[in-house]
């Protein structure tokens, strides 16, 4: 009787073990047979300029060319934001949302809707365009290069926003930033190099060096809480971190600024006070 019990027990145990082994092996076998393809699609917009000058006298607004550099269609969302890139600005962009087919160009128009701006200086806003992927099931949203491929595919779609400067310029402000870029003054202030802008223009730096050392235009340090990039606003000042090798040693500073057309000025030079 005891032998019969152990014999039956061994058969049941062997059967259960076989099931467990099969269940453990099944995912492994499946992972060996099925290949999951991964694709990545960017949804971005190329803007035909690096900055937009909006004259205060404009009644019809200003237009900007845009392009779809991808080989598949995208939706383009347009908006204007305040200098902080968060708050809405008193401008509209038409069309606010539109489809742009692969490799094609289009135009958007920026129109002021209100707002009270200083008359003695420029005001900075941001024109932002965002490429938007299709939703599941949208007929226009097929980005697959090989739709007949039977292998499962994980499609990573990345929506990218591109923002450029929109400079509202009063009629009283004449000329180009490069005409008065040599008016900037510089002085040492602790571990920082301070630049003062006495002009009505936003001075957008292309390059900056003190002595032979280049200054990192994107490194504002912990002192400057406003992440305003590589520019100094009108009638304002800002600080740059001084390279360690040149703290208080170099006496000359050199810089280039970007003009209204996105070009680069000649190099200016001044003595550090």
From Swiss-Prot:
It is found in: Periplasm. Keywords: Chaperone, Disulfide bond, Immunoglobulin domain, Periplasm, Signal. The gene is psaB. It comes from Yersinia pestis. The keyword Protein biosynthesis does not apply. Residues 1-31 form the signal peptide. GO terms for cellular component: outer membrane-bounded periplasmic space. GO terms for molecular function: protein folding chaperone. Required for the biogenesis of the pH 6 antigen. Disulfide bonds join 128-163. Belongs to the periplasmic pilus chaperone family. Pfam families: PapD_C, PapD_N. This is Chaperone protein PsaB. It comes from the Bacteria. GO terms for biological process: cell wall organization; chaperone-mediated protein folding. InterPro entries: Ig-like_fold (IPR013783), PapD-like_sf (IPR008962), Periplasmic_pilus_chap (IPR050643), Pili_assmbl_chap_C_dom_sf (IPR036316), Pili_assmbl_chaperone_bac (IPR001829), Pili_assmbl_chaperone_C (IPR016148), Pili_assmbl_chaperone_CS (IPR018046), Pili_assmbl_chaperone_N (IPR016147). The keyword Mitochondrion does not apply.
């Amino acid at each position: 009787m005891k032998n019969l019990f152990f014999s039956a027990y061994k058969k049941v145990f062997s059967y259960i073990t076989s099931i467990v082994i099969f269940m453990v092996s099944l995912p492994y076998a499946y992972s060996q047979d099925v290949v999951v393809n991964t694709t990545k699609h960017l949804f971005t917009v190329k803007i035909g300029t690096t900055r937009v000058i909006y004259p205060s006298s404009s009644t019809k607004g200003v237009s900007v060319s845009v392009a779809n550099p991808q080989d598949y269609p995208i939706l383009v969302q347009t908006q204007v934001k305040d200098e902080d890139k968060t708050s809405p600005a008193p401008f509209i962009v038409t069309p606010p949302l539109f489809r742009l087919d692969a490799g094609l160009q289009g135009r958007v128009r920026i129109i002021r809707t209100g707002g009270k701006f200083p008359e003695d200086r420029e005001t900075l806003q941001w024109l932002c365009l965002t490429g938007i992927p299709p939703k599941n099931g949208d007929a226009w949203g097929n980005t697959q290069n090989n739709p007949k491929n039977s292998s499962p595919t994980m499609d990573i779609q990345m929506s990218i926003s591109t923002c450029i400067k929109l400079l509202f310029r009063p009629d009283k402000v004449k000329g180009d930033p490069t005409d008065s870029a040599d008016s900037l003054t510089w002085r040492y202030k602790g571990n920082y190099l301070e630049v003062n802008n006495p002009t009505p223009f936003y001075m957008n730096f292309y390059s900056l060096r003190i002595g032979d050392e280049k200054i990192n235009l994107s490194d504002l340090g912990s002192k400057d809480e406003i992440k305003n990039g590589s520019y100094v606003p009108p009638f304002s000042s800002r600080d740059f971190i001084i390279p360690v090798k040149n703290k208080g040693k170099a006496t000359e500073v050199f810089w280039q600024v970007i003009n209204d057309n996105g070009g680069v000025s000649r190099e200016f030079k001044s003595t550090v006070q």
